[in-house]
Regions:
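Bacterial N-terminal signal peptides that target proteins for export
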Residues: 2-15
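Acidic, polar-rich low-complexity tracts and alpha-helical solenoid repeat scaffolds
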Residues: 4-7, 25-271
Length: 271
């Protein structure tokens, strides 16, 4: 009986101590860090396979483990792209802002400005798809206006950029969407005889979205508001503009071959 008890004590001690020793040995073993290039090459393979979720993991690992490494800045620019293609518009926008802040003279800086606007362009697409179906007089379109402003800034800064044609095509849509939205709201106020509010919306289109397809519609709303408010001289001025320009007031932009919410974007250049 004593031998059995002794056996159980020894066996129990072995069961407890041996795993602890193994764990202790493992914890002391050096962790082999993967080389930076391995992470980068892995990210490239994953993006090529459209596995953007996993590519993001590899690129984020470069940022975290090699912040001053050879591929750090390139990984930052490619994170903008990977987030966007993975449908993470907010993360893509933030990554672009970060890149602009940290690398103002980088060869890919134009790409960061471009993608910042593109991310704003697509993140509110749910609102855009509803734009002609519901009363938008109280609907916020700040996202569309932000994208318009960011893409306009990109074209001002980098008119010769390889991404300029892409930005110009999207501005066509944004200009039309914002103008239509403002005039839907203007007509909403007009029907309710809120002429000052309607006038403000229509004038926004004339002043901020010139040469859009909605210019004539905006002028007619302004004329109606002036008439209702008793501003007859101003009304006559608007009538003269309408009469002189007539059918010449059209959208000056060429039609785009891009679909409105195409989830595609160019990758940054390799540097």
């Amino acid at each position: 009986m004593m031998q059995i008890k002794k056996y159980f004590k020894i066996n129990l001690a072995t069961t407890i101590i041996v795993p602890l020793l193994i764990t202790s040995c493992n914890s002391d073993a050096p962790v082999m860090e993967r080389p930076e290039k391995v992470y980068y090459d892995t990210a490239q393979r994953r993006m090529k396979a459209n596995n953007f979720y996993s590519a993001i993991e590899s690129l984020e690992a470069i940022e975290a483990r090699y912040p001053f490494g050879r591929y750090a800045e390139q990984a930052q620019s490619e994170l903008i792209y990977a987030y966007y293609m993975n449908g993470e518009d907010e993360a893509s926008h933030e990554a672009a802002e970060k890149f602009i802040r940290l690398n103002p003279r980088h060869p890919n800086i134009d790409y960061a400005y471009f993608m910042r606007g593109i991310a704003s362009y697509t993140r509110d697409k749910g609102m855009f798809t509803r734009i002609f179906k519901f009363d938008l007089s109280n609907r916020d379109i700040s996202g569309a206006k932000q994208a318009f402003g960011e893409l306009s800034e990109f074209l001002t800064r980098f008119p010769q950029s390889q991404y300029a044609p892409y930005a110009s095509q999207r501005l066509i849509y944004l200009r039309s969407l914002i103008a239509k939205n403002e005039l839907v709201a203007a007509e909403y106020y007009l029907k309710r005889k809120a002429y000052v509010a309607a006038l403000r919306r229509a004038k926004y289109v004339i002043e901020n979205i010139p040469n859009s397809s909605e210019t004539m519609r905006a002028l007619k709303i302004i004329r109606e508001c002036y008439q209702a408010l008793g501003y007859f001289e101003l009304m006559e001025d608007i009538e003269s503009v309408i009469e002189v320009n007539g059918g010449s007031i059209i959208d000056s932009s060429e039609p785009s071959s891009w679909s409105l919410f195409s989830r595609k974007a160019p990758q940054p250049n390799k540097n």
